[in-house]
Design a protein with these regions (language model features):
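Post-Walker A helix-loop "phosphate-sensing" segment adjacent to the P-loop in P-loop NTPases
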Residues: 31-40
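NTP-dependent small-molecule kinase module
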Residues: 2, 144-145, 159-216
Length: 216
């Protein structure tokens, strides 16, 4: 029998999006707005960017170490995106949730699918851009990728966006502040109807995002 002072299990929020949808910026803003959330830091073989900090944004590791961890079953989920591998440490997540800590996990749709299989009680959220043209403008606006990489990211984004129906909620990032409000409502348990996957017009929007040609 559980005592009255038992610690409640933490909640896990899984957020996924195609590259360029604004996921990272939204997650950072959400963390500032919701102090009870903690960011689950993933491991990656990707090269560290100038503005990133090891242990804050990612744990940057070599291919050999990452593969060793994967083979040892230390990842709750892991996937390869654009030639780089990403993984979520199993112990890190399980210990945090058991202690009552609410976690936010920023991953791709492949990782989200694995998380839902392992922890079906998680809340999964997919972020969509308002249009394919806007997605391309955001990718080009970064100024960090070559033309070849941008074209590849747009192709991968089309496949990513085809998986939006798998998620509990869908947030369209047509306005940063509105998208942030929707994410906050979900985290607070207010269940905003506009972020539901049956949102009016969402099917048409998603179809256009997947099939539209890149802006020339």
């Amino acid at each position: 029998m559980t005592g009255g002072n038992a610690t409640r299990r933490g909640r896990l929020f899984v957020i996924a999006a195609p590259s360029g949808a604004g996921k990272t910026s939204l997650v950072r803003a959400l963390m500032q707005r919701e102090p009870g959330l903690r960011f689950s830091i993933s491991y990656t073989t990707r090269r560290q960017r100038p503005n990133e900090v090891h242990g804050r944004d990612y744990f940057f590791v070599g291919r050999e170490e990452f593969d060793r961890m994967a083979e040892a079953g230390q990842f709750l989920e892991h996937a390869t995106v654009f030639g780089n591998s990403y993984g979520t440490a199993r112990v890190q997540v399980e210990q945090s949730l058991e202690s009552g800590q609410d976690l936010i996990l920023e991953i791709d749709w492949q990782g989200a699918r694995q998380i839902r299989g392992a922890l079906p009680e998680c809340c999964s959220i997919f972020i969509l851009p308002p249009s394919r043209a806007e997605l391309e403008r955001r990718l080009r606006g970064r100024g960090t990728d070559t033309e070849e990489v941008i074209v590849r990211r747009l192709g991968e984004a089309a496949e990513d966006m085809g998986h939006w129906r798998e998620f509990d909620y869908v947030v369209v990032n047509d306005s940063f502040d509105r998208a942030l409000d929707e994410l906050s409502a979900i985290v607070q348990g207010r269940d905003p109807p506009e972020a539901r996957r049956d949102r009016a017009g969402l099917e048409g929007l998603a179809a256009g995002l997947v099939t539209d040609r890149p802006v020339s």
